């Protein structure tokens, strides 16, 4: 198994179950190429919800004067591909994602959709490994 200590340091979280982190970093192109039968898409699904919840909870507590509609708009601006892509770049997530050869050759490690999806998957992995 790959040593993810550098990524864990950037995340500020050490995984008890390293397989969860490995799965979060497994792009479908890599899974298909290596016939693994598993990739990060299901974790991405959960990560999106976890990020939405945590952001909503934070905004609810910090922006007590804003009505629901404004909170929703603000959450949407914070939890979007552009923001998640930026967070993924801050921790150099692209250098840890396992991509298939074709995806790698076409710049997948720097593609906003790939990085933002992997970031959501990593958030879900943290959630399942240690809770919120």
Q: For each predicted feature, which ranges?
A:
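RNase III-family endoribonuclease catalytic core
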Residues: 1-132
